[in-house]
Amino acid sequence: MIDITHKPTTLREATATALVTVSDPATITAVQEKRVPKGDVLESARVAALFGVKKTHELIPDCHPLPIEHAEVGFTIGAQEITVTMRVRTIYRTGVEVEAMHGASVAALTIYDMLKPIDKGVAIGGIRLAEKK
């Protein structure tokens, strides 16, 4: 792990996104109407994203354990896609970019897992860091 003891403690922010696409608009309708057999897709993905952010250092070898001061996840629903937006903030010596991307990824995987029984064409793509401060 890189030595960060010499770095100053400052406000660190990162926003990441992930895109989940579906093959049938009826899948999006099922999500919106909470008719997916496995349960409430967006609430499950929200909880999973928060767990993902908090556990990043346990799964990514060179990530430091750091205090997560704020984490929020949002969902933008389109005709055949759901965009996950994950924002993370801390006051620490290192950034939270990987934590934000990990949270967005875990949310996307949760959505995928919950939708695969009703839509065999679900796909995840476009996981990226949208902003870093």
Question: Where in this protein do the model-derived segments appear?
Answer:
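C-terminal binding/interaction regions
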Residues: 1-64, 69-133
